[in-house]
Amino acid sequence: MAIEENIKTSKKDKKSPPMLHVLRSFDINRPGLSINKLNGGVLGGTLSKGTFSIDEDIEIRPGHLNKKTNKYEPIYSKISSLGSSAGLMESVNPGGLIAVGTKLDPSLTKSDSLVGAVVGYPNEVADTHENLDVKIDLFDVAIGSPDMIKVDKIKNKEALRLNAGTAITAGLVTNVKNDIVTIALRRPITAEYNSRIAISRRLGDRWRLIGVGVIS
């Protein structure tokens, strides 16, 4: 096919440790269900690499906020079911949207409370960052702005919004050196080094995409 000559289908990496970006999280239990019939919390998202199988142990990062220490702590659980548009499965490969049933207390997953988290095998999940060093590449004009606003250089103490995988967080620039920007995050994110993020700046009453960056 001609399209394959110009835009090749990416190869699926099944050998690396799995990495699932959580796009939705649910409590699927109906009100009033008896305790012995409760299902664990469900995570929905895309498996970008690796494979998952039922009964495997998983780690979820950043996890939940410990209100005593004001720090996020990883959550550990086990896969109880796997599903896709094709139905229930024993194992899943990269690509497409999947649902991961877990043995988590459903109160941890209700109302999309784990959106933006990353799921993998214990001790093999990417690092969680409270501060980021980002090599930036700014656009000429802000994307989505009807006025074709020119993108100025990022300044120290400027507020930015970052998108990494399915995670969205705000941050404050604490240092700018050439094309490397250090950002203190309001909420930590879990992301691999050398992964790409989207950078937005508030222009008027909306956030506008102004560039991309690579976590260094």
List the predicted regions and their residue ranges.
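Conserved catalytic-core segments of large NTP-driven translation/proteostasis enzymes
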Residues: 1-112, 118
